[in-house]
Amino acid sequence: MSRIGYKVIELPAGVEVSQAGEVVTVKGPKGTLTRNIASDITMTVEGNEVKFTRPSDDYKMKALHGTTRANVNNMVEGVTKGFTKNLQLVGVGYRAQLQGKKLVLSVGYSHPVEFATPENLTVEVPDNTHINISGIGKQAVGDFAAEVRAVRSPEPYKGKGIRYVDEYVRRKEGKTGK
């Protein structure tokens, strides 16, 4: 089932991967990431390659094998390139702005919605209808972007709301009169 787990991770120049028990640490030009991995999965670092092996072929081990490899690969990609999510505000009067370390959204509520920017992320507002969230942790970037989007997710009739730039919003037709 899991063929992803058997793929070898090639380490780019300047990236180090180390393991202490169940904790994997990846150091690279953009920073350092640590993560716990499953104790049953064995990770070996040989030169500039990282390989993963599993003890058995039961369903749970196959799932953990592929997931562990994907998580470590995302860590390697994060410390070399980083991850970015771009959001777009669609709607009359919908605006975003940065006030110090806070992201402030005006999205049709009676009050502005404020978010404290997490320490490990960079939030940019190039214009008042776009938000760029970037960082080295794929999960942290995705979680914060989803949290911002959940404030006013796109509705299907007019498409108003906060959406990812590459997201397709399925539209519905309104009621027809008699």
Curated annotation (Swiss-Prot):
Assembly and oligomerization: Part of the 50S ribosomal subunit.
Checking InterPro entries in the record gives: Ribosomal_uL6-like, Ribosomal_uL6-like_a/b-dom_sf, Ribosomal_uL6_a/b-dom, Ribosomal_uL6_bac-type, Ribosomal_uL6_CS
Single GO MF annotation? structural constituent of ribosome
* One Gene Ontology term, aspect cellular component: cytosolic large ribosomal subunit
| Family the entry assigns | Belongs to the universal ribosomal protein uL6 family.
**Coiled-coil stretches, from where to where?**
none
- Look up the domain of life of the source: Bacteria
Organism of origin is: Lactiplantibacillus plantarum (strain ATCC BAA-793 / NCIMB 8826 / WCFS1) (Lactobacillus plantarum)
Its Gene Ontology biological processes? cytoplasmic translation
Report the protein name in the record: Large ribosomal subunit protein uL6
Keywords, alphabetical: Ribonucleoprotein, Ribosomal protein, RNA-binding, rRNA-binding
- Xref: SUPFAM superfamilies: Ribosomal protein L6
Q: What does this protein do?
A: This protein binds to the 23S rRNA, and is important in its secondary structure. It is located near the subunit interface in the base of the L7/L12 stalk, and near the tRNA binding site of the peptidyltransferase center.
